[in-house]
Amino acid sequence: MAKDAITGARTRFGNQRSHALNANRRSWKPNLQKVTVKINGDAAKTVYLTARTLRAGLKNGSIERV
C-alpha cells in the first residue's frame, strides 16, 4: 500500500453500518497524488502526497513544486 511521505496517511479499514446496524467491511483511501517536489529546500524528489498535505504545504511554504 502506498502512503503519504510526510503524514504517513494510508488506507483505513472499518465497517459500513446499515440502518439495522449490519456490518460490512469497507475501506477509506486517501487522495494520494504522485508529485515531484522540494521539501524544506532539499533536492527534488518524486513522492506520494495526499491532496490535503500538498495544499497545506504549498500554502505555508514548506513544499515547493518542481
UniProtKB/Swiss-Prot annotation:
The keyword Ribosomal protein belongs to this UniProt entry's keyword annotation: yes
GO cellular component assignments: ribonucleoprotein complex; ribosome
SUPFAM superfamilies: L28p-like
Keywords: Ribonucleoprotein, Ribosomal protein
Stated name of the protein: Large ribosomal subunit protein bL28
Any one of the GO BP annotations: translation
Lineage, uppermost ranks: Bacteria, Bacillati, Bacillota, Bacilli, Lactobacillales
Domain of life: Bacteria
Residues spanning the signal sequence: none
UniProt-recorded Gene Ontology molecular function terms: structural constituent of ribosome
NCBIfam families: L28 (TIGR00009)
One Pfam family hit: Ribosomal_L28
Protein family: Belongs to the bacterial ribosomal protein bL28 family.
